[in-house]
């Protein structure tokens, strides 16, 4: 196919997408066709360095050769069987999640895992489990506490604890009995009462603008949950699985329920909800379920991904690259202190706070071969692959700095 035929083909494809896709996303007229490691290519063979990783998903890079091999091999053996039967990979993944978590010092008391297909499903399970535990204690123990700027998903339960009018308003009324506190304010623990069954919080908020929870805040939540018998849920769908340079973003304070997804499948759909023995003991056969969750294909991929993101090599790389990015952004921040006001986050979940809308910077970066995304209000979010190499990082940072310098006066 010659170049002009390809252009016509992909132009037609964009028209097809506009005609047949439910319009839930605003997308640039770029069609991505292949990826390798930290790089992506579009239909015109333009090459991009990916600092978005599919929104913190492709933690081990695009088209990871070992994952590609696993997908081919397992799909030729067994992709799916119902959860009326066991398969050989789901229990292996569940065991590894618990053992690696305990080994890392995360989630004291982690014991059992429910496997699902996505982050929002993992959170739905967490909310249901917390409600079940609560109502066994008291029929009035049904309420939830969440926090400003949180994002927990778009299905009805997860949406109900995502306090953003942009997402919630079209679908009201939502699940009742949800109270919203101020993130990082220990006084928010006062919202937790005898009627509270669950408190859900991100140790590092991603979508809300990349804000890291402090220990005092999380400890206040833990103390009040213990006092009233509520379940503390940590949503680590974006910030977990090595993204902070530790297996889990939480450190000194530990949850009753931990949710994860995104990086666990490196692009293949999977989610998981890990619970303590005390929670698992309250869940009976038939209380919850899933058609595809825990299928052997997703579970085998997840088993491999976990072995890599928990490794010292990958976690050390996260810390090294994080500092490299911070140093580069600090250089530009010195030039434009009124434009770049702060760099937030942890590991390779970083947010560059602009005083003005940075959309021109994002567009300029893309035009010059770097993909970055936004979060919250005027925040550019950087979430590259955890195993990104030095060459790609250096090249990407040069493009980012140029995009900022070239557009600083026009923002």
Curated annotation (Swiss-Prot):
Name the GO terms of the biological process aspect: arginine biosynthetic process via ornithine; L-arginine biosynthetic process
Q: Which residues carry this modification: N6-(pyridoxal phosphate)lysine?
A: 262
EC identifiers of the protein: 2.6.1.11
Catalysed reaction, written as an equation:
N(2)-acetyl-L-ornithine + 2-oxoglutarate = N-acetyl-L-glutamate 5-semialdehyde + L-glutamate
Q: In which pathway does it act?
A: Amino-acid biosynthesis; L-arginine biosynthesis; N(2)-acetyl-L-ornithine from L-glutamate: step 4/4
User: Keyword Transferase, does the record have it?
Assistant: yes
Query: What superkingdom heads the lineage?
Result: Eukaryota
- Transferase among keywords: yes
UniProt-listed CDD domains: OAT_like
EC main class here is transferase
Can you tell me where the transmembrane regions are?
none
* Any Gene Ontology CC annotation: mitochondrial matrix
Keyword terms, alphabetized? Amino-acid biosynthesis, Aminotransferase, Arginine biosynthesis, Mitochondrion, Pyridoxal phosphate, Transferase, Transit peptide
Where does the record say this protein resides? Mitochondrion matrix
Q: Which GO terms describe its molecular function?
A: identical protein binding; N2-acetyl-L-ornithine:2-oxoglutarate 5-aminotransferase activity; pyridoxal phosphate binding
Q: Give cofactor(s), names only.
A: pyridoxal 5'-phosphate
Assigned protein family = Belongs to the class-III pyridoxal-phosphate-dependent aminotransferase family.
Q: What is this protein called?
A: Acetylornithine aminotransferase, mitochondrial
Q: Which organism is it from?
A: Yarrowia lipolytica (strain CLIB 122 / E 150)
Give the gene that encodes this protein: ARG8
């Amino acid at each position: 196919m010659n170049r002009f035929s390809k252009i016509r083909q992909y132009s037609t494809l964009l028209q097809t997408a506009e005609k047949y896709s439910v319009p839930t996303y605003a997308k640039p007229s770029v069609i991505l066709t292949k990826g390798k490691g930290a790089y992506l290519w579009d239909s015109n063979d333009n090459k991009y360095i990916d600092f978005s990783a599919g929104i913190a998903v492709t933690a081990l890079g695009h088209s990871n050769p070992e994952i590609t091999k696993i997908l081919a091999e397992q799909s030729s053996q067994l992709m799916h069987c119902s959860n009326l039967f066991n398969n050989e990979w789901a229990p292996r993944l569940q065991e590894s999640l618990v053992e690696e978590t305990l080994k890392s010092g995360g989630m004291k008391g982690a014991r059992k895992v429910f496997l699902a297909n996505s982050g929002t499903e993992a959170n739905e399970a967490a909310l249901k489990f917390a409600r079940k535990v609560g109502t066994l204690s008291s029929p009035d123990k049904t309420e939830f506490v969440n926090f400003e700027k949180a994002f927990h998903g778009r299905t009805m339960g997860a949406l109900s604890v995502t306090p953003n009018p942009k997402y919630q308003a079209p679908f009201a009324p939502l699940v009742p009995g949800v109270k919203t506190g101020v993130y990082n304010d220990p006084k928010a623990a006062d919202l937790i009462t005898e009627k509270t069954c669950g408190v859900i919080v991100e140790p590092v908020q991603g979508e809300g603008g990349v804000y890291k929870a402090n220990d005092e805040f999380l400890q206040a939540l833990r103390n009040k949950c213990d006092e009233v018998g509520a379940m503390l849920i940590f949503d680590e769908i974006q910030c977990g699985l090595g993204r902070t340079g530790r297996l889990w973003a939480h450190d000194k304070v530990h949850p009753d329920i931990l949710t994860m997804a995104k990086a666990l499948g490196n692009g293949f759909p999977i989610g998981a909800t890990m619970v303590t023995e005390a929670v698992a003991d309250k869940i009976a056969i038939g209380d919850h379920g899933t058609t595809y969750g825990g299928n052997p294909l997703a579970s085998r991929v997840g088993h491999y991904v976990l072995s890599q993101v928990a490794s010292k090599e990958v976690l050390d790389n996260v810390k090294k690259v994080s500092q490299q990015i911070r140093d580069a952004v600090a250089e530009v921040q010195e030039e434009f202190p009124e434009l770049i006001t702060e760099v937030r986050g942890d590991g390779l979940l970083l947010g560059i706070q602009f005083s003005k809308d940075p959309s021109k910077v994002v567009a300029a970066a893309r035009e010059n071969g770097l993909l970055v995304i936004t979060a919250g209000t005027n925040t550019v979010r950087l979430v590259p692959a955890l195993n990104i190499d030095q060459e790609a990082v250096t090249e990407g940072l040069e493009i980012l700095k140029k995009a900022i310098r070239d557009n600083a006066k026009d923002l």
